[in-house]
Amino acid sequence: MVFDLKRIVRPKIYNLEPYRCARDDFTEGILLDANENAHGPTPVELSKTNLHRYPDPHQLEFKTAMTKYRNKTSSYANDPEVKPLTADNLCLGVGSDESIDAIIRACCVPGKEKILVLPPTYSMYSVCANINDIEVVQCPLTVSDGSFQMDTEAVLTILKNDSLIKLMFVTSPGNPTGAKIKTSLIEKVLQNWDNGLVVVDEAYVDFCGGSTAPLVTKYPNLVTLQTLSKSFGLAGIRLGMTYATAELARILNAMKAPYNISSLASEYALKAVQDSNLKKMEATSKIINEEKMRLLKELTALDYVDDQYVGGLDANFLLIRINGGDNVLAKKLYYQLATQSGVVVRFRGNELGCSGCLRITVGTHEENTHLIKYFKETLYKLANE
């Protein structure tokens, strides 16, 4: 099977020349090239910052540090076909949502081509597809056994019978399922489909390990999305990462706005990938996983809560089913927790295979203790009305 990216990416986008400016060639000296305000920021408290200058459009320092970390933690060190990631394999976006939109625009002709999603899944794939007038095809995860794994045979049948599908989105670990999709299943699709790209969204991967990012050097039809919003605790800076072949990363970098990553986002992202802060991220992820198991034990021991969690334990949240799938009770519990106890969780009962389910993010030890107390009190009160 020979993969040719030119058959996937829209021709004008494949040949797109990126925006260039004088700052690409010269970064020091008296900078009079970009029509900036050389007098500095107008807020007095920002006068000593460099915020009157446009940010670095390439972010090479961050890209180099991030790919170095993914290489260090790679599960594929013994696979000779997997090469080290470099900055050339990375494109940055304003959160993963910008990356999702860019990939759809790059590969799918509006009003003609399609994407494939695996519900229950992250809704932004469909939102971005609809905005771009792209049809959404669905192939559900295996919900009957509660595993929420990919039905690879069904997926391949759909892909091989519909040549207009150009992208397949896999959320791993899943949202709202919390289940990591087995890499072997993803690889089977990669090995048997060359008419599009498999996009693996790994927002929660640091809570379970085993990122597919290094595999983009082995499979040219693989794209891996990650973010600093979850394990790194930097949701506020909105920085997403797209790992791809150097060929595809070049195209995505040509498509992006010239200065899409702000100076402040860049500053904090660079701090996040310092060795000491990477260790802190790993330690915090471990604490979250420990608290997740405490929450699981406490909540599934309650009356009116199913004694088995739904989906997986691979993210920073739990999916808990109320009273055998009682959407009415689950929705009341969701509302009462927020309005009476100041605890906001997420009702997910309308998602495929998630009837009666609440998605609960793992908080601090104190927040989780508060949740457990009021969850029990509120649930028992509502169930006995």
From Swiss-Prot:
Positions where N6-(pyridoxal phosphate)lysine occurs in the chain: K230
Lineage top rank: taxon: Eukaryota
Cofactor: pyridoxal 5'-phosphate
EC number(s) per entry: 2.6.1.9
Reactions accelerated catalytically: L-histidinol phosphate + 2-oxoglutarate = 3-(imidazol-4-yl)-2-oxopropyl phosphate + L-glutamate
EC primary class: transferase
UniProt-listed SUPFAM superfamilies: PLP-dependent transferases
Listed InterPro entries: Aminotrans_II_pyridoxalP_BS (IPR001917), Aminotransferase_I/II_large (IPR004839), HisP_aminotrans (IPR005861), PyrdxlP-dep_Trfase (IPR015424), PyrdxlP-dep_Trfase_major (IPR015421), PyrdxlP-dep_Trfase_small (IPR015422)
Record's GO cellular component terms: cytoplasm
PROSITE patterns listed in its UniProt record: AA_TRANSFER_CLASS_2 (PS00599)
Keyword Amino-acid biosynthesis: yes
GO annotation (BP), single: L-histidine biosynthetic process
Involved pathway(s): Amino-acid biosynthesis; L-histidine biosynthesis; L-histidine from 5-phospho-alpha-D-ribose 1-diphosphate: step 7/9
Keywords: Amino-acid biosynthesis, Aminotransferase, Histidine biosynthesis, Pyridoxal phosphate, Transferase
Listed HAMAP family: HisC_aminotrans_2 (MF_01023)
Record-stated family: Belongs to the class-II pyridoxal-phosphate-dependent aminotransferase family.
Protein name, as recorded: Histidinol-phosphate aminotransferase
Gene responsible for this protein: HIS5
